[in-house]
Amino acid sequence: MATGRNIVESTSKLQEANNSISNWCKSWKIKLNETKSVHVNFTQKKIENQPRVKLNGIEVPLDDKAKYLGMTLDAKLNWKEHFKIKRKELELKYRELYWLIGRNSSLTIYNKILTYNQVLKPVWCYGISISGCAKQANLNIIQTFQNKVLRDIVNAPWFIRNSDLHRDLKIPLVTDEIRKYARKHKERLSQHVNAEASSLIRNQPTIRRLRRVLPTDLG
């Protein structure tokens, strides 16, 4: 990853880093798979004639998203793709568990909630202290899934409100869960032994564009 005042500067820095990595891998006889690499420009601007970078002489394909440590980073960092992928993962897992926690299951509500918290909830909670700064429309991708699962767990009729279900079952809304994780994340960063990590809390941008929410705002 490289930053710059413009696309040419950042691409030039990225190419220098790629060359250094390629030389290091050659000296240690490590084979790189260029086809699994992607080139993403993280910016709100529309870029035409994007400069390309190469790895071992092969052009790295341009893409509008990249996967890193289980997170899907899109070019505009609005997290929509990330939550859509998480929703698909949740739907697949829920289909496998429906016989156990669905409307027709004889399992107690307590055990159904326990299963949801232990199996399904960690899927969307992973990295939520960072991706939670997405706009509400994207967070609703997960919230609507949680609403559906809770309704199935208690076999709720159509006239029962989702807010009542969350209150009675003592399940936090997605936005409340985000704030809880964000506070813990902020506390860990402020006490981190690594100066680079702790500086993430102190060095906040002075210019805020488009009223975007930063991860540090959530805590």
Write out the residue ranges for each language-model feature.
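Basic, alpha-helical interaction scaffolds
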Residues: 58-130
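C-terminal helix/juxtamembrane-tail motif
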Residues: 198-219
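Catalytic palm subdomain of template-directed nucleic-acid polymerases
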Residues: 1-23, 44, 77-79
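Hydrophobic packing residues in well-ordered alpha-helices of helical domains and bundles
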Residues: 11-14, 18, 32, 83, ...
